[in-house]
């Protein structure tokens, strides 16, 4: 059984498929009513599963006519998407942000599930046992190197 976040994520991804567009606009209240959940549940899904690292841009307007506009960052070639991810990685990166990048690579089939699990193991805070700043710098270097390898090999 999937949890509510998974169900909402799949629904939004299906909207992209059904409309065959790179932009989907949804209303918080409509989604909350459809799935009998609170709007904050939708916010959680958007903030964790439709991030830049996953290949999406979000525009949000609150209030009476509020909406969430989700735009797929479509790069027609692998190099464009990888370069987009490289721009997102600064001199350091948190474990969660790095996981989002790996999730995006997996989602777009640049890596398989086994490779994703190996990458998670390498960039995990339990593997990189050191002070937070050093850990985040090393993690960023690992992710950048990984992206370069995907880009050029």
UniProtKB/Swiss-Prot annotation:
What keywords appear on the UniProt entry?
Answer: DNA-binding, Repressor, Stress response, Transcription, Transcription regulation
Care to name a GO molecular-function term for this sequence?
Answer: DNA binding
Q: Does the keyword Nucleotidyltransferase apply?
A: no
A single GO BP: regulation of DNA-templated transcription
Keyword Nucleotide-binding carried by entry? no
Q: Which family does it belong to?
A: Belongs to the CtsR family.
Protein name according to UniProt:
Transcriptional regulator CtsR
Question: What gene is this protein a product of?
Answer: ctsR
């Amino acid at each position: 059984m999937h949890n509510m976040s998974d169900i909402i994520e799949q629904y939004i991804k299906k909207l992209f498929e059904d409309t065959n567009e790179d932009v989907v606009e949804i209303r918080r209240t409509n989604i909350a009513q459809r799935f009998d959940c609170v709007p904050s549940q939708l916010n959680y899904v958007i903030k964790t599963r439709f991030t830049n690292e996953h290949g999406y841009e979000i525009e949000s307007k609150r209030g009476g006519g509020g909406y969430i506009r989700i735009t797929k960052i479509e790069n027609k070639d692998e190099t464009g998407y990888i370069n987009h991810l490289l721009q997102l990685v600064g001199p350091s990166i948190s474990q969660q942000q790095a996981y989002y990048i790996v999730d995006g690579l997996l989602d777009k089939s640049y890596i398989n599930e086994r490779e994703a699990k190996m990458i998670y193991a390498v960039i995990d805070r339990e593997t990189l046992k050191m002070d937070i700043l050093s850990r985040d710098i090393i993690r960023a270097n690992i992710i950048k190197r990984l992206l370069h390898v995907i880009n050029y090999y």
